[in-house]
């Protein structure tokens, strides 16, 4: 596509690529607030716009990493975090890892808009579609676990801009300047000219700490203990098991007048999470010696925090459960003289913003 190629060339032609990308995304985010109210109030339109902006953000991130790949490997190590090196290692090891990760990311940000579309035009198929999407995401996560030797899939399994902006601009400017760099004829490598290189002592002092950020491949090849793999598998199963129970409850509800809220799926999901956390604590001493364990520990913590948010807001049933009890608990506020009405309006506004947040959390 010529327009897309032209767009990429304009973004990547100089060292200000990152600033251009950030400015474009910021302008588009501001433009979303200028849309008519129907786009912001309508949940389907709002979620669709959010998903499109996230996809554009990830497209720009891919372009920036393409620019980083043009630098020498020693300079790339300055910009690439442990998380980035982890993803790139498995991308090289298994060609399907990148496609599976991108597909999982796309499904994560598009599941809720897809569900809204189906619930609007074919409500009877809403739970069937969500169960199908959760099944596909489950298979993708299991594939990632198999590729990485049992690691828990990252909540965002694609590259992120976790590098220093000033360093990125400085290095890009340094190696794009023909006066400070030269391309070797045989290897086509870009190296700095001799007159731009510091003395050997300065070079060692400046480069040694940077080279220490390069992680050897061996830290990613070591397999996790079986118990930790089982714990990660429980976490991967939890969303699918929860949705399977809810799908069964919905079918049962259609065939009878049952209107009682099902606590069973929530309790099962909570038990799954508690079991996995107990296993993690037991295996922590065994895995703490594994290099790169910090990334796995941060992943487990973020997954658990996400689960806590979902658990306390009752997941996808916020509207019919949490909202009901909030309204009942605040029914007395309106009876307060003078300030009661204004306080109730303030609480309702806060509740509306909470609803919008919970709808973005979805069912994971």
Curated annotation (Swiss-Prot):
Give residues where Phosphoserine occurs.
Answer: 200
Name the Gene Ontology biological process terms. peroxisome organization; protein import into peroxisome matrix; protein import into peroxisome membrane
- Report how it sits in the membrane: Peripheral membrane protein
Record's GO cellular component terms: peroxisomal membrane
Task: Give a short account of what the protein does.
Answer: Involved in the biogenesis of peroxisomes.
Q: Could you tell me which InterPro entries the record lists for this protein?
A: Pex16 (IPR013919)
- What is the annotated localization of this protein? Peroxisome membrane
Keyword Phosphoprotein attached: yes
Q: Give the record's family classification.
A: Belongs to the peroxin-16 family.
Whether DNA-binding counts among this entry's keywords is no
Q: What is this protein called?
A: Peroxisomal membrane protein PEX16
UniProt keyword terms in alphabetical order: Membrane, Peroxisome, Peroxisome biogenesis, Phosphoprotein
